[in-house]
Amino acid sequence: MLNLFRGLALFLCVGTAWGIVLANQGDILTVRQFSKHVPGGDAGLHVAVMGTLTLVLGLAFSEARVFGSRLGFSRIVALMIAFATLEEWQQRLQPFRRFSFRDLLFSYLGIALAVLVFMLGRRLLARFRSPDRE
């Protein structure tokens, strides 16, 4: 089951990368049409995509081992912050895109919400797994 979930997480990463490539090549109209269906428009899309990626990658790979040590959720969050920053910054180099500090803040908000959901979920699981104290 974990391998299936990891495959889904990687598929989501590829889909996100494909959306970025389309936007960088000037197919921004497709992205804008899609963002009309997301509450909050483009800002909501940044929150949803970065939050979902962070949460799904964290759930799928936080216990994975890389070079003998556990990857951990905090490293995944650090990678997502770096990814969001670099993705927004690279838009300065693209003819059809522009850097937006607002978009970057909404990407960070999505990551922060994913961290909150992950931490609350872990606490709830720990509470339900521990024996009831009477």
Language-model region placement:
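Bulky hydrophobic segments
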Residues: M1-R102, Y108, A112-E134
